[in-house]
Amino acid sequence: MRTHKLLASLAAFVLMAAATLVTLQAKTSTITGGRGAEKSSLAPSSRIREPLNLAILIQDDLVSRVGNELNVTREFIRALPGGSRVMVGYITSGTLQVRQQFTTDLERAAKSLRIPTGSTAASPYNPYVEVREALLRFDTEGTNRNALLLISDGLDVSRGFDFSSSVNSIDLERAIREAKSREVAIYSFYAPSVGLTSWNRRAVSFGQSALNRLADETGGEAFFQGTSFVTFNSYFNKLGQTINKQHATE
């Protein structure tokens, strides 16, 4: 008799504990959005709807704050639709350092991002030679739309420090021609480097004007706000919305 009572009490205790656990899990799910869920930095409308071939190029001598934007950059990559292909590269000391060749493994591409060195030793004379080199890696076949995201200060001082030399540079024009021939739309996020664009307003103006021309003449868009550094969350939201609108009108 005592054994039956003990078993009954134990069963009741187990049921009560299980009910409590379920209640706690439900509350936790409500608060966090589910197990492992994280609040997204990107608006639902910014998620790319159609598969994309995307090359992301980052200038390696950008200010250290750019390193804080890697998480939202990874989030953008991971949110791309299935069938998308991503390449990641860094423009450093006049060379293109490819961290990840074009791949459909979006997680692998996201993990290939690293913090820019943020050193003048990594400064290129201009980013456009490496932009053209990256463009040559796009396939000429396939149905995906082609896009390149350049995160850079845009400044070209290889042939002098003046407006004409920067905005009408030979390397910039070559990059534009290559992008057009391969049907690659170039988008850009402005960020200052540790060099001239971190303190010289003329340099900022030259760089932003060059980025604007590059994007405008290739069917993309340049994103910058004033002359100071701006976090990338709003840029990625606008980028996704812009690409979706362009897809819808094609």
What label would you give each PLM region?
Residues 2-11:
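Bacterial N-terminal signal peptides that target proteins for export
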Residues 24-250:
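Scaffold/interface architecture of coatomer-like assemblies
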Residues 10-20:
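Bacterial N-terminal signal peptides
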